[in-house]
Amino acid sequence: MLSTYGEILRLNRAWRFSAAGFILRLPMSIMPISIILSIQAAYGNYTLAGAVSAINIIALAVTAPMWARLVDRYGQLKVMGPVFAVSAVATIVLFVATLQMASPSILFVSAGIAGATWGSPGALVRARWIRTTDTVSQLNSAFALEAAVDEFVYIVGPVVATVLGTVLHPTTGVAVSIVFLSVGAALFLSQRSSEPIPLGKAGRGARATSDGTEGSKDAAADAKGAAASAPARERSLLLL
């Protein structure tokens, strides 16, 4: 199994966007607990801390499908570049507001914006695998690898957040999330060669389906296109 993963990671240097996607996903599991720890330490109020963290998560869940549709139409860099920038700025505002014990309304607004401008990094990575792999077997292995990465992120993230928030400073987890978001987004979006072709630019022959899935290769000539159309069709709605 490890040798199989090694083979697909070497396809067109796919390990580069996969590793960047891993970094980009880490804040998703670090932020919720970090928000609770930092706000509770500053305000001494678990109710406020839980509410702000909940707003962040709800905003993410509500807006992720919208960003997925826009990414399919206009491309990952064009859409998610500005979106990730706004998310980073909003998280910085949340970080500073917590340290300064600002009005709770600022916490709610900044946390909501930070979550609403997060999107679904896992779906972005999977879309690149669809473009990178050549066979259904390779695509299945790639998706299995990303599923393992998802599990690792969700297991390790809360542990990292707890250790950082208790051993160092309650706001450390939020600060680290800002770094991971900024670095991960820059590394991931800068890799243009693996970015899927937006539907707005793809020719009629490059469209595998009519429901928002782009076909990165000629669907009529490539057997993978027909066999992998089902998982590809779902990629825009894949949420971590």
Model regions and ranges:
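Juxtamembrane intracellular "pre-TM" segments in multi-pass secondary transporters
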Residues: 1-14, 191-240
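Helix-loop boundary and gating motifs at the non-cytosolic
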Residues: 1-61, 237-240
